[in-house]
Curated annotation (Swiss-Prot):
Job of this protein: DNA-binding protein that recognizes sites within both the enhancer and the promoter of rRNA transcription, as well as upstream of many genes transcribed by RNA polymerase II. Has a role in the termination of RNA polymerase I catalyzed transcription.
Name of this chain's protein: DNA-binding protein reb1
Signal sequence, start to end: none
Pfam families per record: Myb_DNA-binding, Reb1_MybAD
InterPro entries, per the entry: DMTF1_DNA-bind_reg, Homeodomain-like_sf, Myb_dom, REB1_MybAD, SANT/Myb
Segments for region (Disordered): 30-51
Coiled coil: none
Gene name in the database record: reb1
Length: 504
């Protein structure tokens, strides 16, 4: 096993005490990142159609009073790292029935390309006939003095997959679990017991990655729905770059900077130079031949994303937002020029402008109002009427028309509003319109959705009924010509005429 992905400080037994493990539970973002959950309020009824996660009793151990046992078992995992190095076995899949773990069989030699932690000091193992599995350890001072941009741009490589697979193999042996039980537990929105403690230990062992990144890849390892994009992939020629492709690029970059006598930071500056130097053009030409199944443009952009000299990737201060605003006024949307002036990725500048800065003080982060939701649905319906229904929705344009929410907020809210519900039949449309008519009549022309939701008895959420009402308004001509109350009464009468025809 390539233990260079670990923090060597943590290889000293006894370094992590029970107190430090308990204190790590106080970390923020202890929840995972299930798709669309962030920033959204979800109704328990919305999950009625989903698969009920089955948490194994073996993993539902109460943490109070049993932390010592969990910790001792986890420390034994660290103590057995040397044994794991000698075992090159993958997770056995015999115990799995319907869901199997997608383990890589791409046979990438993890010693053939640059390790993520060793990247900052240009350390590389030589591939020779008598090569061993001994890791190249970096002193704590070297880790501290690494270029700060490395952590933000860390790439998950074959070495990390190998290590994660072996960790899970040993974890299952320690707790006498099969991988089906682990997979069931990973369906839970929050981890418990020894599995939660293992994730916290992995966070300390792989400091280049956040807890969220580790959890995403762990769930992808066990084929949890929604995490397919993080799974271990071979070279496909499309989509995200696979493990083999990433390994080839890393090896080519290492060979190139060794030949040129550069540091990696110098290489990053060269590929981001205003005019691409001849040596860099030769590097790309050679790389295109190595990855001939890939489009040259996708390779070019992948290398620039993976190797860039910019330190900050996520956090923006108010001063930087104001600087970005001034640069857009001065240079327009020339993101390459703006990115060079601000020492940031051009795409980061573009996204920050598009998602935050251009809204100014109008941007809202609080809960959506009913008026905003209605306006969002109407905007999407209008755009779909203009364009082909099969085409993707332009969420940037939707956000621009709404004026108070970002494109991501609009997209997530629309998906929440239109999530799958029981289909409205003709009689149910009449039921819905009658409840809306009564609410309008009794509340001065206002719709009290909370009362209608109670009468629905959990069959539909407020969002689903609102979406259906907006669709009905588009279908029924009377809503274009009459006030809301009168149009609703007319629609009810029309539907009842149709129903009476069916009954006859």
């Amino acid at each position: 096993m390539d233990t260079s992905v670990l923090n060597p400080e943590l290889q000293i037994h006894g370094f992590i005490g029970v107190d430090s493990l308990q204190s790590s539970r106080k970390r923020k973002n202890d929840f995972d990142d299930f798709p669309l959950n962030k920033g959204l309020k979800t109704n328990n009824n919305d999950y009625s159609g989903s698969i009920e996660p089955k948490f194994s009793p073996a993993l539902s151990i109460k943490e109070d009073g049993k932390n010592d046992r969990n910790f001792e078992a986890l420390m034994s995992l660290q103590a057995q790292d040397s044994n794991l190095s000698e075992q090159n076995t993958s997770i056995h899949l015999d115990a799995l029935a319907s869901s199997s773990i997608a383990l890589g069989n791409d046979n990438v030699d993890s010693s053939a390309f640059l390790s993520k932690v060793n990247k900052g000091v240009n350390a590389m193992r030589n591939s020779t006939s008598n090569q061993t599995n001994d890791s190249i350890l970096i002193s704590p001072s070297e880790i501290t003095n690494m270029d700060p941009f490395l952590k933000g741009s860390a790439r998950w490589t074959a070495e990390h997959w190998d290590y994660l697979e072996r960790r899970m193999q040993n974890f299952c042996q320690t707790y006498s679990l099969d991988h089906t039980q682990v997979a069931d537990s990973l369906h839970e929105k929050r981890l418990h017991g020894p599995l939660s403690s293992l994730v916290k230990l992995l966070v300390q062992e792989m400091p280049s990655f956040t807890r969220r990144t580790i959890l995403r890849h762990l769930r992808a390892l066990y084929n949890i729905p929604g995490y397919e994009k993080y799974s271990r992939k071979n070279s496909s020629g499309r989509g995200d770059f696979g493990v083999q492709e990433t390994a080839i690029i890393s090896q080519e970059v290492h060979n190139f900077i060794m030949d040129q006598g550069w540091s990696e930071y110098q290489f990053c500056n060269q590929i981001w130079a205003g005019k691409c130097p001849k040596t860099i053009r030769m590097f790309y030409s050679n790389l295109y031949k190595k990855l001939s199944h890939r489009d040259a443009k996708s390779i070019y952009h992948h290398v620039r994303r993976a190797y860039n000299p910019f330190e900050d990737r996520c956090v923006w201060s108010k001063e930087e937002d104001e600087e970005l605003r001034k640069n857009v006024v001065e240079h327009g949307k020339c993101w390459t020029k703006i990115g060079r002036k601000m020492a940031r990725m051009p795409n980061d500048c573009r996204d920050r402008w598009r998602d935050v800065v251009r809204f100014g003080d109008k941007l809202k982060r609080n809960a959506w109002s009913l008026e905003e939701e209605t306006q969002l649905l109407q905007i999407v319906a209008e755009l779909r009427n203009r364009e082909d229904l099969s085409s993707d929705i332009n969420w940037t344009l939707v956000a621009q028309m709404l004026g108070t929410r970002t494109r991501l907020q609009c997209r997530y809210k629309f998906q929440q509003l239109t999530k799958a519900a029981s289909k409205f039949e003709l009689q149910e449309n009449v039921w819905l319109l009658e409840r809306i008519y009564d609410s309008l009549l009794n509340n001065g022309g206002k719709i009290h959705w909370e009362n209608i939701v109670k009468e629905a008895n959990g069959r539909w959420t407020r969002d689903q009924m609102l979406f259906q009402f907006i669709n009905l308004k588009k279908m029924i001509p009377s809503y274009d010509n009459l006030p809301l109350l009168e149009a609703t009464k007319s629609a009810i009468d029309d539907f009842k005429v149709v129903l009476s025809g069916f009954s006859n």
